């Protein structure tokens, strides 16, 4: 027993010595004259050969900083700001436009409430809550299904740049249709206005579906270095330009741009109330014009990667092999993914993808790892179907709740802005306050913990909605039929801001971590498509919301809030149990990826194989 304890005490020192010897050995083998170890994207007097890849010892010892970020990256973020500002400014007023009937005394017939009506909301078509909920959910559903097409086109056929260009075109046409739908003649003929609105919704969804999955990957493409690089400063100090931290900074700026744009929907909320819907729909189009202008200016400075058609071809072939034969048995015994590994295929005598046509196997073992990681990520994404419902996924119900409360001259759809405002405030607090504090005390706030914590916080927003809706029913002059009551309940609508604040706080943990996992566990050539797979969860949420639309009416609205809140909390518990060892799985995946990289490099050097495979996945987009 004494001997065993002694060995256990000394083992870390032995491991450390062996590790240090290994690093020294690897450093000795490092070729400082090999041009492959240098990048000439940046050259100066202190770095005459360019930036250099770090040795293993340098990777552990040198100070790490954020690398040079091109101004074109920030210009693309401005494009995202303008696109999201126009999108949210439009969608934020759709509920009032569709649900509420125009007041007979509305000035000029534009939909604004008459002067002297502090608690009245703007209205136009008067189609009711169910129609408003159905169409807003249709917009959400289509806006997050079209990215699957946009991601495929961006990765495999027309490329990301052309996909974005077509998205801009469809988006501009959509804003024109919204303006046509808001003129007095269209509002007076509610069916005509509704038809124009539906066309605009479909067109806007197509534009968003082409832009959204391709713009963020294009932004990340602008970072010049593919790996960590060593830079010598004028002081003589050598530092590492950390690719992970640099991509994290870019992504945070991008995410901040999204929410600043979303916050600007406050302008259209007041436009619809003070003037009418034509101005409320015209302002987003003006914002949208920024997008093509900035894209035209920044185009010559962009690094645009061509589409890689072979990627999707290989994915389809791999899936065909995986689901051939008795795949159910392989799923059961844990050999499902091994079946498509070229090494396993050769071992069982399969040297062609298609024996009859003698089609060659065009992928490597690492392809299987990449696709497996993508599918594993999608398992987590499935939980976001419920999360999105809690995260203002039933926006029409929340807007309707606020409309039944005392507004005191504030537009009922203004409160949606508490979501982006909370994110704008909270993200810097997390990045520069909470997370560094946790690191100081060596508390590892693991990805699965962040996601589950976000789910719990977001579920509290629906519990708050349950309490408020119950209070409205109890205090409204119309009792449990308060939605369309002419007199509001004597409860200040500002209390409803808690719904949006809590949901946004949950989003800061759950959403940003999901982006991180999506990009960490997917090959770069499939970034757009994997991002689209995450977005499509919102489409499933919208479909589920459409399914429960018949229940979205008095006197049952408070039970809807409670059910979604409890479902979100339950998802957090189940997901934590299922993915408790997620960090260990990710570490094993990283080790497996490095092993496959070494094997393929050795085989290529020996001339055994010449296989194109994806470059390494982005390590993280959020630290």
UniProtKB/Swiss-Prot annotation:
The chain crosses the membrane at residues 134-154, 163-183, 191-211, 250-270, 277-297, 385-405, 418-438, 448-468, 499-519, 529-549, 557-577. GO terms for cellular component: membrane. The keyword Transmembrane helix applies. One of its GO terms (biological process) is protein transport. The keyword Transmembrane helix applies. Belongs to the major facilitator superfamily. Proton-dependent oligopeptide transporter (POT/PTR) (TC 2.A.17) family. This is Peptide transporter PTR2. It comes from Candida albicans. The lineage of its organism: Eukaryota, Fungi, Dikarya, Ascomycota, Saccharomycotina.
């Amino acid at each position: 027993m004494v001997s065993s304890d002694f060995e256990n005490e000394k083992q870390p020192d032995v491991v450390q010595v062996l590790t240090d010897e290994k690093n020294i050995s690897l450093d000795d083998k490092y070729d400082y004259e090999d041009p492959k170890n240098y990048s000439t994207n940046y050259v100066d007097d202190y770095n005459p050969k360019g930036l250099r890849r770090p040795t293993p010892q340098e990777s552990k010892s040198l100070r790490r900083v954020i690398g040079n970020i091109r101004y074109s990256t920030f210009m693309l973020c401005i494009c995202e700001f303008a696109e999201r500002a126009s999108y949210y400014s439009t969608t934020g007023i759709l509920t009032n436009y569709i649900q509420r009937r125009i007041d007979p005394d509305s000035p000029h017939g534009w939909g604004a409430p008459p002067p002297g009506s502090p608690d009245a909301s703007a209205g136009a078509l008067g189609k009711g809550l169910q129609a408003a909920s159905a169409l807003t959910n249709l917009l959400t559903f289509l806006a997050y299904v079209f990215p699957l097409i946009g991601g495929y086109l961006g990765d495999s056929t027309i490329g990301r740049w052309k996909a974005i260009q077509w998205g801009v075109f469809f988006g501009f046409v959509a804003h024109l249709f919204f303006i046509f739908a808001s003129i007095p003649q269209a509002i007076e003929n509610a069916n005509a206005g509704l038809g124009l609105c539906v066309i605009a919704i479909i067109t806007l969804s197509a534009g968003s579906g082409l832009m959204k999955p391709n713009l963020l990957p294009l932004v990340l493409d602008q970072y010049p270095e593919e790996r960590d690089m060593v830079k010598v400063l004028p002081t003589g100090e050598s530092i590492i330009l950390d690719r992970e931290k640099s991509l994290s900074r870019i992504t945070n700026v991008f995410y901040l741009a999204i929410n600043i744009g979303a916050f600007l929907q406050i302008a259209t909320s007041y436009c619809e109330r003070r003037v009418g819907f034509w101005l409320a729909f015209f302002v987003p189009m003006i914002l949208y014009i920024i997008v093509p202008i900035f894209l035209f200016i920044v185009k010559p400075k962009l690094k645009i990667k061509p589409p890689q058609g072979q990627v999707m071809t290989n994915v389809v072939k791999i899936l065909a092999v995986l689901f051939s034969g008795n795949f159910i048995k392989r799923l059961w015994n844990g050999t499902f993914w091994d079946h498509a590994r070229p090494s396993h295929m050769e071992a069982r005598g399969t040297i062609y993808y298609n024996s009859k046509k003698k089609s060659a196997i065009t992928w490597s073992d690492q392809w299987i790892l990449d696709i497996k990681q993508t599918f594993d990520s999608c398992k987590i994404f499935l939980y976001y179907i419920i999360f999105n419902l809690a995260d203002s996924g039933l926006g029409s119900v929340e807007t309707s709740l606020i409309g039944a409360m005392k507004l005191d001259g504030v537009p009922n759809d203004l409160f949606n802005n508490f979501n982006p405002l909370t994110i704008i405030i909270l993200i810097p607090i997390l990045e520069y306050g909470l997370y560094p504090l946790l690191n100081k005390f060596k508390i590892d706030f693991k990805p699965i913990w962040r996601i589950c914590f976000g789910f719990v916080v977001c579920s509290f927003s629906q519990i708050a909605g349950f309490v408020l809706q119950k209070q409205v029913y109890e205090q409204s002059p119309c009792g449990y039929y308060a939605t369309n009551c002419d007199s509001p309940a004597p409860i200040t609508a500002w209390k409803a801001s808690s719904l949006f604040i809590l949901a946004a706080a949950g989003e800061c943990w759950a959403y940003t971590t999901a982006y991180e996992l999506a990009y960490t566990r997917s090959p770069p050539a499939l970034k757009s498509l994997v991002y689209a797979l995450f977005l499509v969860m919102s489409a499933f949420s919208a479909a589920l919301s459409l399914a429960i639309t018949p229940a979205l009416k008095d006197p049952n609205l408070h039970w809807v809030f409670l059910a979604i809140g409890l479902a979100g909390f339950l998802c957090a518990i189940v997901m934590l149990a299922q993915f408790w060892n997620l960090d260990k799985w990710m570490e094993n995946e990283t080790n497996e990826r490095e092993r496959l990289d070494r094997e393929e490099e050795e085989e290529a050097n020996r001339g055994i194989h010449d296989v194109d495979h994806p470059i390494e996945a982005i390590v993280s987009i959020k630290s």
